[in-house]
Regions:
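Short helix/turn-capping signatures at newly exposed starts of structured segments
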Residues: 25-152, 159, 179-199
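Short, structured protein-protein interaction patches enriched in aromatics and acidic/basic residues
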Residues: 157-164
């Protein structure tokens, strides 16, 4: 009788686990990468002067190398695009339907540029997406230049104080003339939209 009760309890627990996993997998906000023990303590990926995670200027622009370099944390999709008049290979690292990291490579077949949009990936200096301009710079002069973000917002790109290989793209509200950098007083509340590493 006790054996029947144990089997019945085990069967109930198994069915419960299957339903729970099926429910999680079906929800759009769920990511299988969250089940990885590495995700329990935050991202192990870091941005440095050398690259992002294990990816650097010597990493081949192929799926296996990039997946390994990003700890298998994302779903990858690839394609080609024209950037500054050159045809480049692009890998997009996705979490569900959100772009988290974009990697670009030129004709030599190596990674040449990485754009990080994932708030969980910090630089080795503690900088991350969402940080305000005022946390890193007191003024734009000498470090920043005007640009336009992918989202067509007003934007500036500022070279990291720690490395010329790392830049921060800041976006924010400004109604001034196109082509000019906003005043430092306006910029102080702009936030990092993406962190860029270049070879």
């Amino acid at each position: 009788m006790q054996e029947y009760s144990t089997l019945s309890g085990l069967r109930f627990a198994t069915i419960g686990c299957v339903l729970l996993l099926a429910g999680c997998a079906g929800s759009s906000g769920f990511s299988w990468s969250n089940l990885s023990p590495f995700s329990w303590f935050g991202s192990s990926l870091k941005i440095s002067a050398q690259g992002v995670g294990e990816i650097n200027g010597l990493t081949a622009m192929n799926k296996d190398a990039i997946e390994k370099g990003l700890d298998g944390k994302y779903h990858l999709r690839s394609g080609m695009e024209t950037k500054n008049g050159q045809l480049v290979t692009v890998f997009q690292a996705m979490d569900s339907d959100q772009l988290k990291v974009a990697l670009f490579g030129q004709e030599d077949g190596k990674v040449s540029r990485i754009e990080v949009l994932d708030e969980d990936i910090e630089t080795v200096w503690g900088t991350k997406v969402g940080m305000p301009f005022s946390a890193l710079y007191s003024r734009a002069f000498g470090a920043c230049q005007n640009t336009v973000s992918e989202s067509e917002k007003s934007a500036i790109v500022c070279v990291s104080p720690q490395s010329k290989h790392v830049s921060y793209l800041f976006t924010g509200n400004w109604n001034g003339p196109e082509g000019l950098i906003p005043s430092d007083d306006v910029l102080k509340n702009w936030k990092i939209e993406r962190i860029i590493w270049k070879r």
